[in-house]
Amino acid sequence: MARVTVEDAVNQIGNRFDMILVAARRARQIAVQGKDPMVEEENDKPTVIALREIELGLVTADTLDADERQTVREREAAEIAAVAAIAEGRNNVI
């Protein structure tokens, strides 16, 4: 198991409390949403991977926010396309 000191991660984020929030969000993305880690997994748990990504400056609150906004935009575009396809199908039937 890799030993991770949180001091480097804290220095990247600014304070322990925000670091915990960012690490939890990123770990959830990796574990639940299936996002790919940006570092080697090395049999580490998602929380350790998230801390290592933060340490290296790969993940910040801003990058997580931007990623979530992009995901929402993609989901909305897919929904609009699906509704348009349904509406077009109804117009072709009439």
Curated annotation (Swiss-Prot):
UniProt keyword terms in alphabetical order: DNA-directed RNA polymerase, Nucleotidyltransferase, Transcription, Transferase
Domain of life (superkingdom): Bacteria
A GO MF term: DNA-directed RNA polymerase activity
Pfam short name (any one): RNA_pol_Rpb6
GO cellular component terms listed in the entry, alphabetical order: DNA-directed RNA polymerase complex
Gene3D superfamilies: 3.90.940.10
EC number: 2.7.7.6
InterPro entries, alphabetized: DNA-dir_RNA_pol_omega, Pol_omega/Rpo6/RPB6, RPB6/omega-like_sf
GO annotation (BP), single: DNA-templated transcription
Reactions performed catalytically: RNA(n) + a ribonucleoside 5'-triphosphate = RNA(n+1) + diphosphate
Top-level class of the enzyme under EC nomenclature: transferase
Subunit structure: The RNAP catalytic core consists of 2 alpha, 1 beta, 1 beta' and 1 omega subunit. When a sigma factor is associated with the core the holoenzyme is formed, which can initiate transcription.
UniProt function note: Promotes RNA polymerase assembly. Latches the N- and C-terminal regions of the beta' subunit thereby facilitating its interaction with the beta and alpha subunits.
Classification via HAMAP family: RNApol_bact_RpoZ
Similarity comment: Belongs to the RNA polymerase subunit omega family.
NCBIfam families: rpoZ
UniProt-recorded name of the protein: DNA-directed RNA polymerase subunit omega
Lineage: Bacteria, Pseudomonadati, Pseudomonadota, Gammaproteobacteria, Alteromonadales
